[in-house]
Each structure stands twice: as C-alpha cells, then as structure tokens.
Amino acid sequence: VADGVSYAFQGKIFAAGRLWLEPPLVPDAFKSQNVLLNGTRWCSLYPPGFPLLLAAGWFVGAPFLVNPVLLGLAIFGVFRLGTVLYDQATGVLGALLLAVSPFALLMGADFMPHVASLCIFTWCLAFLAESCKGIGARPLLVSGFLGAFGVVVRPQAAVLFLLPALIAALVARRKEIVRSIGFLGLGGAAPLAFLFAYNFALSGHPLRMGYVVNDPSLSFSFTSFAFGFSPSRLFWAHFPWFLHDLDATVWGFPWGDLLPLVFLLIPAPGRRRDAWLAACVLALVIGFSFFRFYDISHSGPRYAFEALGALALLAARAFRMAGRLAASLLERVRLGRYRTAGAAAAVVFLALFPLGTLLPEQAEALSHAYHAHTPEPLRRLKAAGVGPSALVLVAGNTVEWTYGSFLLENGTDPRRAPRVFARDLPEKRAELLAAYPRKEVWRVDVTLRPLPHPNLWIDNTWDVEGIVWSRLR
C-alpha cells in the first residue's frame, strides 16, 4: 500500500546515508502518496523508526525480509512474555497462536510498520514484567529503550499501548520509583534524542513531524486526532467495529476469536497479570476508536495490530482454562485417560484451522492489485524489451496510486540513474525528456478494474485489465 511504499522509500534513503533526498527535476512527475516532496526535501512523511530497520534490509539487498524477521522476533517475544508472566506452557501456546494468525502473517509480508511496533511493544512488556521481579537495572534500561524506540516507530500507538503497562510496573516498584524512572529515562534517552534531532532537521522543531510539514493544518492535539469530528460519534462508530473485526480476523475460529476470553472471568491465579495485558489491549483499541480513520489493511483492523501479542497470550490463558474445565469433566465421566489425546487434538485444531481456512481466503483476496499497487508491469519490463538506459513514463486510470509500484525502482538521484520511472504528464513530457535524456523512452499504460468486496475484511482490491508497454523513442 502507499504507506508501505513511503516507509520503504525512506529506508532506502537512510541506507544511502541521507536523511532526505534533493527534489528531482520535474517534481510533479515523481509525486507519490504519503511522500513529502517540496522545494527542498524528498522523503517519507512518517516517523523514522521503521525506516531505520528497513535500511538494514536495503544494505543487504533484501528489505522484504525485515518484517518477516521482526514477526519471528515478535513470536519469540510472546513466548518470553508468557513465560515471565505465567509459565512456559502458556508462553508456547501464546507464541503458537500468534504464529498461525492470518492477520499477523499477511501483515508481515509488507512494508507496514505495525509488525515492527508489535515486536518492540511485546519485548518492552516482557522486560517491564521482568523488572517487577526486582532483577537489577537491566530490564528497566532495556524496556526504557524499547518503549522510546516504539515512540520513534509509531508514536500514538506506543503511548496508548504501553502507558497502562508502564503505570502498573511503576506501581509495582513504588518503593523505588525514583530509581525506576531514572533507569527507564536513561534507557529511552537515545531513541528520543534521535527522534527530536530528526524532527528538528526536517521541520525546524523537535516535536514537529513530517505529517505536519506535509500538511501544516495538522497537529497532534485531540481535536486533530479526530480531524474535527465529534469524538463521541467516532468512538461509538469505531469501537464496535474494532470488536467485530478482531473477533473475525485474528484467527477466524468458528466460535469467534474474542468469545473464549470469557473464561478469564473465572477466578484463578494470575488474573491481575491478565488484567495488565487486557488494559494494554483496551487502551490501544479505545484510543484509536477516537481517530478519524478506520481501515482494514492486510485483512484486519491495523490500528489494533500491535495488540496481537498480548491478545494471543490472553487467548492462550483462556484456552488453558477451558482445557482444565474439559479435563475435569472427563474425569467426572471416567474418561480421564483421554485427557492427553484431547489436549493434543485441541492444539492441532487451534494451529491448523486458521491456516487452512481464513489464511487462503485472505491471501487470495490480497493477491490482486491491493490498493491499486501491482508488481505485474515490472515483471513484464524485460519481456517488453526495455533497455538499461530508459526513461519510463507511467500512465493509467489509477496512476496516482499505481505509480507507487514504480517509485522504489528509481535511484536515489534519478538524474544519474540508468533507468528513470516517472508519471506521464503530457503537459510536462518535453520537460521530462530534456531533464532525463536516456537512450530509450518508454510508456507503460496500466489499466485496473476495481473488484467488489470479496469478503467483509478486504477492500480496495483491483484486477489488472491491461498492461501496454510502448516504445516512444
């Protein structure tokens, strides 16, 4: 999607050792959604945390591996968090549930920052939980660093999700609260200093992010968060949507994904820790219920994605409680010998059902031109005969969105790149030809047709109707 293209673009810029690029010649021909392009700067408008991680992928020529690696680390983080809070069995089941979530797997296949923040937030919770056991200063330093870096990745989500956990951890350490705050602040100093320095370089103010540079009418006040809409109206529209969509898209179980959480209402040891995780989940969902936008991205409500680690552990706790009740029932009817087999069958079902039902359905829907982005024209570039020195003019009925599929193919300085991909602007074609003289000039016309919603949780998909490569010179 356009957001992912913007993040990947900034990662490429960081990998080149730059904070931003010089504006290209004929800048209107390089405009892409969610990319800041003004008289002095060409860069992403998003926070710099995730592009820093993507830069490592660009260094090794594989930026597409960054999110899968981060998802793997997030899964291990759920195991670690579950082990610290409860026991190893809960950690294993929680990690398994996250690993088989179609929502998590499909989000992990793109350049969106939510997987990074899921990973960072989950590990931050793990070290905060460890710090409550009084094990030295290291957990506080690490959780401070991770929490602050989470702000550099997704500021609003980090504050909403981590604030309840931070408050609870400080209450648990209230006898040495000053020391705890000091270590947390020391750990978080470097990421926050980087964010403030980056913002200052980009906008002239440490708290003014690229969003505001791109659109000066924005701010990070509550009113701006709601974009002028009634907060109560937004909440009562969005909060039920979050609950409905989370119930249907995290795993796609036939009984619903949130219903098993009712087992957590049964009194049992560890319920305070359950409440700690639930507070983080609810704070994130409630907070973004006041946001102007509500969208489904990669098969689920993306503004709640960072809660999946905590939600997986809560589901694991609920399933284990249900398992204990089922085992007790088997004992009462003298079928206790089937306890182990029943537990194994239940785990296999929990693991395989999402992978065999919801995942193929959602993956097929996403295999179309999602948000009007498609790699198909570039796949046909070689067969069309496009040479190494070429100016490629991109046209089509959705070029405003589709051009993002070509943006990353440009060099960091299009003037010196062998191939240049620009939007075909007829009124500026002569200017483009003069600015980027290449041996060949090509035009690619991409025609897309919007599809009806294939299901309740995938939208903005298109079919490729035609791709025409034509050599102009």
Regions found by a protein language model. Name each.
Residues 53, 83-89, 124-140, 150:
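Membrane-interface transmembrane helices that cradle and orient dolichyl/undecaprenyl
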Residues 103-116:
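Short acidic/glycine- and proline-prone juxtamembrane loop motifs at membrane-interface regions
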Residues 166, 185-189, 193, 282, ...:
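Signature aromatic-anchored transmembrane alpha helix within multi-pass, membrane-resident enzymes
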Residues 73-75, 166-169, 240-278, 282-285:
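Hydrophobic, aromatic-rich transmembrane alpha-helices
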Residues 63-86, 123-127:
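Transmembrane-helix motifs of polytopic, lipid-linked glycan transferases
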Residues 98, 147, 164, 183-191, ...:
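Transmembrane alpha-helix segments characteristic
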Residues 91-102, 126, 147-151, 165:
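Short helix- or helix-capping micro-motifs
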Residues 127-139, 159-192, 196-197:
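Perimembrane helix-loop-helix junctions
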